[in-house]
Amino acid sequence: MQPRNNDILTPSQLNTLARDLLEGSFPAIWVEAELGSVARPASGHLYFTLKDARAQLRAAMFRMKAQYLKFVPREGMRVLVRGKVTLYDARGEYQMVLDHMEEAGEGALRRAFEELKARLEAEGLFDPARKRPLPTHVQRLAVITSPTGAAVRDVLSVLGRRFPLLEVDLLPTLVQGSSAAAQITRLLQAADASGRYDVILLTRGGGSLEDLWAFNDEALARAIAASRTPVVSAVGHETDFSLSDFAADLRAPTPSVAAELLVPDQRELALRLRRTAARMVQLQRHAMQQAMQRADRALLRLNAQSPQARLDLLRRRQLDLGRRLHAVFNQQQERRAARLRHAAAVLRGHHPQRQLDAMQRRLAALRGRPQAAMQRLLERDALRLRGLARSLEAVSPLATVARGYSILTRTDDGTLVRKVNQVQPGDALQARVGDGVIDVQVK
C-alpha cells in the first residue's frame, strides 16, 4: 500500500514534530546528574552531557544564562539543573537546554561552608586573640552531644579513667538533621547563662559533610564566640573541620582527645602529690637549719658581750625565740599534715592502700623529728649559757674582794687607788671589803 503524498514527511518535518512533542510534554524539569564532556567555546555557551550510571543525555546552557553561574562546571561534578527537553533539528539530537545550574550534594555544601567561613573570619569571629583560656582545674563540665552516639561513650570512658572526681552533666541533643543546629545552639546558650560550668564541650562522632552540617550553622558559630564559658569543639574525625571548631576556644581532633585535654590523669596527680610532700620535708629541714644558724649567731654575739644585764637579756630573747620557733614550726607542720590528710582522703578510693600507709608513716616520722631536734638545740644553748655565767663570775671584781682583798678609792672623788704615789699623808680613803666599806686615813 502506497502512502498518500500528505502522509510523507521530510526529516526536518519529523524533527520539528518530535521537538514540539518533547517541549509540550516537558515544560520545565529538574535533573540531578554528573557532568561529563564539558566544553566552553569562545562563544561563551556551555556544552556537556548529563549522566548517571546507566544513561546520559546532551545538554547546553547558552551564554546569557551561563555568565551568572557561581561556580566553574568541571568534569565529574555533581549538579542540579533546570531546563526544557528539546530536539536539535539540524542533527535530530535529543537534549536539554538549561536556564539554571547549581552544585549538588557535598560539593554544594563545601562551597557554602567556604563562603560562610570566609565571611565570619573577615568579621574577626575566629581571631585567636578573642579566644578564652581553659581553666587549669575543671570541676564541672557540660557535654552537649547525642546520648546514644559513640562520642559520648568515648568521652565518659576517658573522663572516668583519668579523673573520676569530675562532675559531668550530659545535655542530650540531636547532632544531625534540620533541627539539630537550633537545638545545639539553645543548649549552649542555656549552659553558658547558668554559670554552673567551667567548660562546655560540643562533640559528635565522624560522618559525611552533610552529617556534620549542624556544626557549620552560622547562629551556632556566633553563640560559641559570644559564650562567656570556654567552649571546646570535638566534631568528627581528625581530618574533619567545622565552623564550631574555628569559633571554639579549643578544637580537639576527636572526642577522646578532648576528654584527655580537659582533665589530668589521676596517676600523674598522685605523683605530683608525692613530689609536693618530699618538697615539704626539704623545706622543713631548711627551716630547721636556718633556726639553728640564727641561734649560733645569737650565742656568738652573747659571748662577745660581758655585762650581766645583756647576758640575761639575750638569754630571755633566746628562750623566747625558741618558744616562737617551736610554735610556728608546729603550726606549719600541722597545716602540712592537714593537707596530706586531705590528699590521702581524696585519693583513698583511687590509689593502692600501701601508698596511703607509706604517706601516713612518713607524716608520723616528720612529727617526731622537729621536736627532738628542738629539744637538743635548747639543751645545748642552756649548757653554753651556764658555762658563760661561770666565766663571768670568775673574773668579777666582787669575787676577788670576797677572797680577802679590798678596793681603795678616794673619799672626795671616788678615784680608784692603784699605786702608793696617788695618796699623801692625811688623805681620806675608803676600803671596800667583802662585807662592807671602811673609812681610813693615810699617815
UniProtKB/Swiss-Prot annotation:
GO: which molecular function terms?
Answer: exodeoxyribonuclease VII activity; nucleic acid binding
Keyword ATP-binding in record = no
Q: What is the predominant subcellular site recorded for this chain?
A: cytoplasm
Name of one Pfam family that matches: tRNA_anti_2
Question: By its UniProt entry, which InterPro entries does this protein fall under?
Answer: Exonuc_VII_L, Exonuc_VII_lsu_C, OB-fold_nuc-bd_dom
What's a BP term from Gene Ontology annotated to this protein?
Answer: DNA catabolic process
Q: Where is the signal peptide?
A: none
Give UniProt keywords alphabetically. Answer: Cytoplasm, Exonuclease, Hydrolase, Nuclease
- Spell out the PANTHER family in the cross-references: EXODEOXYRIBONUCLEASE 7 LARGE SUBUNIT
Q: Which family does it belong to?
A: Belongs to the XseA family.
Under HAMAP family, the record lists:
Exonuc_7_L
Protein name as catalogued = Exodeoxyribonuclease 7 large subunit
Q: Which organism is it from?
A: Stenotrophomonas maltophilia (strain K279a)
* Gene this protein is translated from: xseA
